[in-house]
Amino acid sequence: MDIYDDKGLQTIKLFNNEFDCIRNDIRELFKHVTDSDSIQLPMEDNSDIIENIRKILYRRLKNVECVDIDSTITFMKYDPNDDNKRTCSNWVPLTNNYMEYCLVIYLETPICGGKIKLYHPTGNIKSDKDIMFAKTLDFKSKKVLTGRKTIAVLDISVSYNRSMTTIHYNDDVDIDIHTDKNGKELCYCYITIDDHYLVDVETIGVIVNRSGKCLLVNNHLGIGIVKDKRISDSFGDVCMDTIFDFSEARELFSLTNDDNRNIAWDTDKLDDDTDIWTPVTEDDYKFLSRLVLYAKSQSDTVFDYYVLTGDTEPPTVFIFKVTRFYFNMPK
């Protein structure tokens, strides 16, 4: 379960079994602790435990720029009927793309009671699973009635990538749209072509994945969504198949970028084995419509130029004005 605040920052993250790979290693650290309800143990920053936690958080959190983990692990033990008061928070994030968290990893789960209670503005949350929650939230450990609860607690700091905007996908998901390609799998390119006697379509939109494959999204005045799945191996193929005004173009010349650039990605980081995402559901098509409209509204202020040269004599130069937005589709 993921819960966000009104600024779009994650405040609660419930985990399933992601930390099973290190749970026994953490238990081993504290196996000799018998006479203390709480103890802190410094770790090396590059310890396997810290590194594995960092990898899990990068994988499970969305839109992350940086994860910092305090190398001190706090071990806490709760016996039946220990009285635990509500812990009040007065921590306030300094920026709208940064949050500090407590990560709680269960080492021993009580038979009854002992859940963590989080006081959230939209309703209180109780959990006896591994959980990460923002330090902006008040919390309380409920009384253990039967058995014992032992947990490991770590301080986590997360910086998130700043999104350009967020586009509604469905009732449960909004998709962050970025101008930064790092960590993204797809790029929507809204393309305007300089007037040229060989050009038939002057505005077009394609989604380009990490392999360089292109899915035609729109080609009618920049707003009509193409419903049939038209996939090309490269943007050069899109030009030959859609943009140019005559079918013999492939036979007359080929296209290259003089800087060996891909229209969306760093060429040296292309992954040829990646299949391109294609729309299937009504939510997919509605999202694309919203994305195209947003890109069109930004195309006069957020853009770059991309040039392809045809090997004619003299060379034929095609100049494309490109607005790029990077994103990931929900899994």
Curated annotation (Swiss-Prot):
Domain of life: Viruses
Record protein name field: Protein C10
Family: Belongs to the poxviridae C4/C10 protein family.
